[in-house]
């Protein structure tokens, strides 16, 4: 039996034809995790995405997209909508993702996929699918607890909170500590991030004081841990008046709650 989790961004960023400036296209992830929750091996599994539907924000027109690359785990799988997962052992999972970009800003409205597997299992592939769930993707992150691998994981929204879906088939709640966190300027143009020490996974999203004009290059925790590059980032969102809001994000686990955020001007 297979559980399929899809991870779709809501917004994709490219040029907005209704603004005078030309905005750059930003690559985004369309992700899938295939978890074999049964007792038998799922042999020679392939997933082929249908053409995702991405519409332009203003007029609802379909937008073309470019596939920059496909991946199964960390292995490059070409630039097509087909991903070959091979065999998936019982009680294990594999991660797939497509890296894409569009020329225009827009949003995802629809995504479908089809599946092929070896006949040795018998029956149509749909008979093997226990559950299909689609999630709003926040970011590719990396769970770095002991025993984890070096494959990126999916941080997704769930109601008012978050969950992280890891490459070994687990999914766990993520505490949203944005409401208890603070950012303060320190020497060298850097920022001090503080929130309560927490066991478990945490995600913090706070307004970026530099409004996207500086680059976040390093995050250091008070106990000496240097966060992986996957686990801190900057984001932006378009407001109804066409202005932008800018944010700083940190994802971590079992944390002291005290960090130094190191910025660069370029």
Regions picked out by a protein language model, each given a short descriptive name:
Residues 17-43, 159-195, 200:
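Short beta-strand elements of extracellular/lumenal beta-sandwich folds
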């Amino acid at each position: 039996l297979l559980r399929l989790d899809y991870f779709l961004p809501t917004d994709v960023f490219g040029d907005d034809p209704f603004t005078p400036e030309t905005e750059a296209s930003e690559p985004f992830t369309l992700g899938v995790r295939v978890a074999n929750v049964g007792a038998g091996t799922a042999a020679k599994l392939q997933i082929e995405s249908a053409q995702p539907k991405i519409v332009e924000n203003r007029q609802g027109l379909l937008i073309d997209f470019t596939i920059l690359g496909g991946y199964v785990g960390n292995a490059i799988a070409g630039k097509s909508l087909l991903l070959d997962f091979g065999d998936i052992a019982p009680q294990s999972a594999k991660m797939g993702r497509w890296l894409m970009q569009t020329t225009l800003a827009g949003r995802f409205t629809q995504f479908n996929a089809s599946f092929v597997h070896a006949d040795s299992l018998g029956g149509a592939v749909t008979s093997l699918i226990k559950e299909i769930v689609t999630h709003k993707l926040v970011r590719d992150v990396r769970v770095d607890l002991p025993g984890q691998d070096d494959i990126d994981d999916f941080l997704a929204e769930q109601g008012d909170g978050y969950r992280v879906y890891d490459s070994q088939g687990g999914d766990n709640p993520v505490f949203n500590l944005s409401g208890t966190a603070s950012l303060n300027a320190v020497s060298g143009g850097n920022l001090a991030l503080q929130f309560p020490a927490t066991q478990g996974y945490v995600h913090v999203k706070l307004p970026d004081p530099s409004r996207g004009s500086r680059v976040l290059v390093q995050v250091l925790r008070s106990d000496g841990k240097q966060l992986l590059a996957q686990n801190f980032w900057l984001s932006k969102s378009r407001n109804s008046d066409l202005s932008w809001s800018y944010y700083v994000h940190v994802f971590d686990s079992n944390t002291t709650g005290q960090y130094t955020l190191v910025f660069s001007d370029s």
